[in-house]
């Protein structure tokens, strides 16, 4: 399963969040794999696309909870969305 984590730094925690990222790099726990991570330069926002099980994603989000506010969304690719849409119109 692919999961998009949308994050922003907690108010007042920008520097500690950046220091933690520079120190460790934000690795995900076993059971998850980073597909990509994007940052808005000079801002507090970013996205992290992860593939894996929800337990590992929950652990990862929890590891950053004191520094980042996260929204977690399951995401699918175009072919999967098209398959679902075709089933809707087949009714």
In which residue ranges do the predicted regions lie?
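Conserved, structured core segments of small domains
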Residues: 1-91
